[in-house]
Structure formats: C-alpha cells, structure tokens
Amino acid sequence: MRRIVVGVTGATGAVLGVELLRRLKQCPDVEVHLVLSRWARTTIHLETELSARDVEGLADVVYSWDEQTAAISSGSFRVAGMVIAPCSMKTLAGIRTGYADGLIARAADVTLKERRPLVLVPRETPLSEIHLDNMLALSRMGARIVPPMPAFYNHPASVGDVVDHIVTRILDQFDIESPSAKRWNGVPGAKDSSLKVVNY
C-alpha cells in the first residue's frame, strides 16, 4: 500500500485537486492522506458543486490545516510522496523558505528533507520574477513543478478533458497509469523523414 499526501490550497483550480482525488480513489494500492487549507474550502465552494466534506470523503485520512501533530508532519511516517494541487504562490513561497505555518507546508518540508517526490501544481498567471525564482529554487531542491498547462494535440472538447490530461501528467510523476489518458504517439501515418520544419 502506497501512501500519497494530497494538499489542496485556496488558489483557483480546485477541480484539479478534486479530480486527482477521484482518480487516486480508484487505485486500490494507494492510501490518500488529505489536507485542505483554510481558503481551499472557500474555493471548493465557489468553483465546484461540492462541499469540503464531499471532497474529504474522497480521501482515506483527513487532517486539519493546522494539525501540526499529524502523522504526515514527521519524516518517520513513510509516504510515497506528496502533491499540492492547486498550489498557491503563498504556499510555494513558504515551502521554498522553509516557513511551515500550516500542515501543508510542513508536510511538503518533510517530503523535501526526506528526498521523496514533491509535486507542485502552481496556479497563477502571469508569473512574476518572484514566482519564477521560487519555482526554480524548488526545482533545484528536487521538487517537480507541474504547471496545469493544457495539451491541444488531443483535441480537448471540454474543461473536463483539459483537467483529465493535467491530472494524468500529475499521476505520471508517481508512475500511476491513467486508463483515460490520451497520449502523444506521433503523427499518424507519417515517417520521420517526411516531416519538414516550417518557419513562420
């Protein structure tokens, strides 16, 4: 059984965290430990038709945002890694500087120091120099920065299609297969020698 910690912050894009939880719930070998930040509850209410309690029901273990005595606040509690989706710029900055003012940042700090996979899904646009500097620093520390950027080669027909692809890329970081994934497999019927570079 693999334990994966999921943090959901108050940044817009609550559906990313919700869909990630739904997909993880379908994995019989994964135990999900969830933390919703204070503002995540508000964002979930504003952006989805779910309540915070509905979202918590998708996890195996749920912690309060300020529960610093939680199991996931210690490196001796073994987990396979952590995802923060969506990840606010405040949370990102806190993780970069080691300022763990809540359980999400503390669990991320532990994940980094234990050299376990930490996947951050930053939600902000445009990005300032501060945001970019924080992401670069965290990437150098070993965190995986997975911005929720859509792919268009799979011809998404809905927001759901876009979210599905982004969540697939998040799950890829843990080698968790997605049956619904629409992956790039090259140009159908084309040979490499026939492809030409076109300058616009």
Predicted regions and their residues:
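A cross-family phosphate/adenosyl-ligand binding-site feature
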Residues: 1-119, 125-200
